[in-house]
Amino acid sequence: NISFVTNEPFLGHFGVGGMGRTRRAMEDEFYERDISFHLNAEIAGITPKEIELKNGTKIGQDFAMIMPPFRGVDAVMNSQGIGNPKGFVPVDEHYKHKIYPNIYSVGVAMAIPPCNTPVPVGVPKTGDMTVQMARIAARSIASDITGQKSDPPPDIHVLCVADAGDTAMFMYGSPFQAPRNRTLVKKGRWAHWAKVVFEHYFMYKIRRGMTYLP
C-alpha cells in the first residue's frame, strides 16, 4: 500500500491554488493507482515503523521518503535585511530587491507570497519559470546600467510535465498565479516523450551557449 501525505488542502493544489482541472486529474490518478492520501497534513513524529501526524493519525511504513520544507542559503539567512525568515529574497515585479536596488533574485532564491491555506504550502518555482524571471531581471539590469526606464514586465506562465509511471501529465497556466487567462491540463504518453525530447534540446542549447533559442 502507498500513502501520500501532503500539506496541500487538495490534490493538485501545487501551492498555487490548483490550475484548471488539476484537482480532478490528480484525484483520478490516485484512485486509479489505489494510492491513499492525507491532506492538510503536518508530521508530528517519525519512527522506523510509523509516521504520526499532528491530528493523531498514525501511518505504518516500511519505507518513507520525507521532503522537509525548503529554506534559503545560510548567506541570505545570516545577512540582516537581505532575505525573509526562511532565507528567500523579497523582490518587486522586475525581481529587484525591495530595499537594495543592486540585488536581484530569481528562481528558488526569491520569495513568492504563498496562498492562504490551513497548513502553509510553498509556491513552486520551476525551471521554465526561472528562465522567464532571469530574462526579466536581465532586461532590468540593462536598463539600470544604461539609465533607461524598465518596461513593464510580462506575466510569467507555468509549464510542468509531471511523470506518472508509464504516462505523464502536461500542465500549463498563464499567468502562473490566479486569476488566470488560460489553463491546460492533458495526460498521455506523448507528454512523457515530449519531456524527454525537451530535456535533450534544452541541455544542447545551454551547453553551447545558445540561450537566444526559445
Language model features with spans:
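FAD-site-proximal beta/loop scaffold in flavoenzymes
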Residues: 58-63, 67-131
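Flavin (FAD/FMN) cofactor-binding core of flavoprotein oxidoreductases
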Residues: 152-171
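C-terminal auxiliary extensions adjacent to catalytic cores
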Residues: 170-214
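N-terminal FAD-binding dinucleotide-binding subdomain shared by FAD-dependent oxidases/monooxygenases
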Residues: 9-17, 42-43, 159, 200-214
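A Rossmann-like FAD-binding core segment of flavoenzymes
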Residues: 1-90
